[in-house]
């Protein structure tokens, strides 16, 4: 349950903490089994009724999906020992991400609710990137899980429909439960306060990209679009990249890599920014655009994505064709050139984000868990 940007951690961890907090408020006791980074079992209790067991299973630095998959059997073995000792007998299991689904199937015969978060067959490879070593295995396991689990949760109708194309079993098992957005993103400090606190210039444009260092997040394309925009617009501007380290020798200049940041620091970054850039070609949902919209910050997204469709129809940002990088740069230029456009999109964005609450999300999850559970364990 690391912070987004640390190792392989991303928006899924943000979602899980929001869900666990909501389930706790509803009095739903929950045990979470996750990999430990150390050699001993650690237990944390972030919310009443919620226990997170960090189970050692051969953590390797730097972490990789390959090393994580190689540790699944050891993780399962040690989780069995822990579950016996703690007398954990779940009446329903919720698995998040395909490897968690593989482990959960081995650990428990209880009904399983799966949330893929991302599906391998839908991923759009980054330019020049080859097939990931785990890709064939992941596709096989994701297809098997679609057949075996009780229900599959997707975050939007768009995501469910796209997943059905590659996993037809979801036509009968799929259910849509959108995530929520934390209250703190609705109540930001003034821009001048945020910029002074973070040490950024008071004047000029600030574009923000928040994503871990994964080629599929398309950070390089976003930086190139910003550079192209700067060739045509001479006002002051900087481009912030949060969640990843920059290339060697890339320090200084108008592109600033902030490295890994705690999620608690994101509201201040959104408050300082004039626009948030979200160039990833495939997200099952995308919490960063949602947080930015709730914060009243215009977003820039590619078409052919959930947020591309929603923003095109409801506003809150600009959409560009994914195969035309010059149009990406045009969108940045349009935002830099017009305070009136930014103000209009800011108001639209808050309205677009308004339906996404943790109260609705956790109420739906509570109902789904109850409908799938078997009598027995209180957890």
Label every model-predicted segment:
Residues 281:
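Aromatic "clamp/platform" in nucleotide-sugar-dependent glycosyltransferases that forms part
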Residues 1-50:
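N-terminal subdomain of nucleotide-sugar transferases
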Residues 298-302:
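Short hydrophobic beta-strand element within catalytic cores of glycosyltransferases
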Residues 201-217, 223-227:
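Conserved donor-binding/catalytic core segment of Leloir-type glycosyltransferases
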Residues 187-200:
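A short helix/loop element that forms part of the nucleotide-sugar donor recognition site in Leloir-type
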């Amino acid at each position: 349950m690391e912070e987004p940007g640390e190792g392989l951690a991303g928006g899924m961890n943000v979602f899980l903490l929001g869900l666990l907090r909501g389930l706790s408020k509803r009095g739903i006791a929950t045990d979470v089994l996750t990999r430990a980074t150390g050699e001993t079992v650690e237990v944390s209790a972030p919310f009443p009724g919620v226990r997170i067991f960090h189970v050692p299973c051969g953590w390797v630095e730097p972490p990789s999906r390959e090393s994580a998959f190689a540790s699944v059997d050891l993780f399962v073995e040690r989780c069995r020992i822990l579950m016996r000792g703690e007398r954990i007998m779940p009446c329903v299991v919720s698995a998040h991400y395909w490897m968690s689904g593989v482990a959960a199937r081995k650990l428990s015969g209880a009904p399983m609710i799966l949330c893929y978060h991302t599906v391998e067959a839908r991923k759009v490879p980054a330019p020049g990137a080859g097939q990931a070593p785990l890709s064939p295995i992941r596709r096989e396991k994701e297809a098997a899980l679609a057949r075996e689990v009780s229900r599959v949760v997707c975050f939007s109708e768009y995501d469910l429909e796209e997943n059905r194309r590659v996993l037809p079993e979801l036509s009968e098992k799929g259910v849509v439960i959108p995530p929520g957005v934390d209250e703190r993103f609705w109540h930001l400090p003034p821009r001048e306060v945020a910029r002074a606190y973070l040490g950024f210039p008071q004047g000029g444009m600030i574009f923000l990209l928040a994503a871990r260092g994964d080629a599929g997040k398309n950070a390089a394309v976003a930086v190139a679009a910003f550079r192209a925009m700067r060739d045509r617009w001479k006002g002051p501007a900087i481009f912030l990249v949060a969640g990843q380290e920059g290339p060697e020798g890339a320090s200084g200049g108008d592109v600033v890599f902030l490295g890994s940041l705690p999620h608690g620091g994101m509201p201040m970054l959104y408050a300082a920014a004039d626009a948030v850039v979200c160039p990833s070609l495939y997200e099952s949902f995308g919490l960063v655009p949602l947080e930015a919209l709730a914060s009243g910050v215009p977003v820039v997204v590619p078409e052919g994505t959930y947020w591309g469709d929603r923003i095109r129809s409801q506003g809150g940002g600009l959409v560009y064709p994914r195969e035309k990088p010059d149009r990406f740069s045009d969108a940045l230029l349009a935002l830099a050139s017009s305070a009136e456009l930014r103000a209009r999109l800011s108001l639209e964005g808050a309205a677009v984000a308004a339906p996404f609450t943790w109260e609705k999300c956790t109420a739906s999850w509570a109902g789904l868990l109850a409908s799938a559970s078997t009598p027995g364990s209180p957890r």
